[in-house]
Amino acid sequence: PLVRLLTDGMNAYVTADGYVFAAPRASSLYVPVVTGSYRPPFPASYVGSVREHIDLRLGEIDERIAELEREKYPLYRREMENDRNISALRRMRIKRQWWRLEGSREFDERVDALREKKAALRRTYRYRARVIREEIERIAGLQEAERRKQKKLEKSYEDFMKLLTFVESVENDDFWRSEVVQIAAHTTPSGALEVELTPRSGRFTILFGRLEEVERKFGKLERFYRRGLPSIGWNEYRTIDIRYNDQVVCKK
């Protein structure tokens, strides 16, 4: 295994290619440990490939989207029927019945009656069209919510794999493998994954932030280790923040 997860109720080992298995009770494997409130994109009891779990969940969501699409079919048929009724309503006309020697008064009465009938039908069809359209849009909204779930799931998986890559990069560097004692991962309110590092040297916590531009951040931190901390003092600050471009922000 590459790492042990002790986050948000998890206690599992993960390999570099994303295979999860439960931590054995009788023994421990000496690998880096990730703690914190971070919630991986799989349940605590899961054993297996994380990618397979994600694909299964995405497939379930696809089925739900397709199921919702089928709910639209009768609404589309009702909408087409309503459109035909509206077209037929526009074609309704009154012709004078010359063969019955219809007078102007009788004709005008029939015209008024037809106008009232058309007005009532127009209101009915417009109301029906609005109700049908609102129901279609409601279902479309549910589909969009499912698609957002898919995007969130993919982003969660992407962050998880970034975390594994990050741990691997620490392990592959002799200096940082010795210096980083603990990695704490958490999810920000915006949904981004950020990490904090507990180093062997000093009494501070390193706010690493998002797992982006990892090499640049480690390079910046290493320069600060060599040029800044020896003169400032290793126990002067409580946090060292390297989340910002070309800056190292220290707080007591």
Q: What do these predicted regions represent?
A:
Residues P1-K252:
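Charged, solvent-exposed interaction patches on well-folded alpha/beta domains
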